[in-house]
């Protein structure tokens, strides 16, 4: 079994990523196995911002159905399917680790839920064959960054078991501030300032500051009125380890305020 020495945070942006070839981020995700991770993982654990539960939950299904959890988008998007196999054993292993290593009293199993668009849209571009078993893990927006970082620490050993750990969220996420007049891919100043702070903090290894982003970051509440789109980042940071080296693997913008900044975290050997 080949170990996976990296974890990843992916900004999944708008659901239109699934069909809009003009988006730079779409080309980035489509080039994943050529440019980012040629190694094929045994299975994938994806932490998506779009599954928010009171207690940690994993989906344990034989096959993942495709959840179209968005409205008002072009009809072809609702016909897209990404029915990758489930990863029941991985889900049970995640539950075991969160309780044993993470000290969590309760972790739920969902035997019906498939993949929401935070998971299937990027994965459909990255691994279009849909032949890798996938388990999804929820976030808890009633908790904080350190909680999710510690959740990731509890899951770190999965990398040694050939599991690719992906957090899918967004470096900035304020849907009320999207500017449909900006069509040239340029960002507005407040969003860029937050995005640069996040980039610099990660690349300099200041993970403690990122855990306390609500107090430390400029324009924190503007960039993330709600925290759920950043919490997948904390999980993959924790899973990579405190000595992990961060690298920005993509950056682009949509509608002025939506950052596609994405990062890898390479664990120290």
Curated annotation (Swiss-Prot):
Organism per entry: Arabidopsis thaliana
Transmembrane segments: none
Keyword Nucleotide-binding: no
Purpose of the protein: Opens the cyclic ring of caffealdehyde between carbons 2 and 3 or between carbons 4 and 5. Involved in the biosynthesis of arabidopyrones.
GO molecular function term, any single one: zinc ion binding
InterPro entries reported in the protein's UniProt record: Extradiol_dOase_DODA, Xdiol_dOase_suB
Keyword set, alphabetical order: Dioxygenase, Metal-binding, Oxidoreductase, Zinc
Free-text disruption phenotype from the record: Deficient in arabidopyrones.
General remark: Arabidopyrones are derived from phenylalanine instead of tyrosine like other ring-cleavage-derived plant metabolites.
Tissue specificity field: Expressed in seedlings, roots, leaves, stems and flowers.
Enzyme Commission no: 1.13.11.-
UniProt-listed SUPFAM superfamilies: LigB-like
Phylogenetic lineage: Eukaryota, Viridiplantae, Streptophyta, Embryophyta, Tracheophyta
UniProt similarity note: Belongs to the DODA-type extradiol aromatic ring-opening dioxygenase family.
Free-text comment on the cofactor: Binds 1 zinc ion per subunit.
Coiled coil location: none
Name this polypeptide is given: Extradiol ring-cleavage dioxygenase
UniProt keyword Cytoplasm present: no
Cofactors, names only: Zn(2+)
Gene that produces this protein: LIGB
Chain sites annotated for binding Zn(2+): 12, 50, 173, 229
